[in-house]
């Protein structure tokens, strides 16, 4: 419940910057994942500052390929380095055997893409779009 409250606050503060309505599209997926974290074997971590959630992340791990998948990561943007810190600590504590980390889609947002590229990925996957033929 506390994570949902933090997420709603995070959304409200960013909606006026969202030129492509990505936040609204993402919101439904976030709430579904929050509601089903345990049943789909996801791990969740958070950071508290002054007694309140300042960041949270949700991910999963595939041992056969030693890869952690970071599905969601949100943090107070005013706190410099918090995104990096939660990313580091979550991987250390939840997925210490991970050799690879999949940071998933950047939703076509330049700032998100730049942040993900700053981790110096070893490979970027091609994106494909499927359209139903009518």
Give the ranges of each region predicted by the language model.
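A conserved beta-strand-loop-helix scaffold within acyl/acetyltransferase catalytic domains
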Residues: 1-76
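A sequence-level detector of short, solvent-exposed, charge-rich linear segments
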Residues: 22-29, 120, 131-134
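Aromatic (often tryptophan-rich) hydrophobic motifs at membrane interfaces
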Residues: 43-133
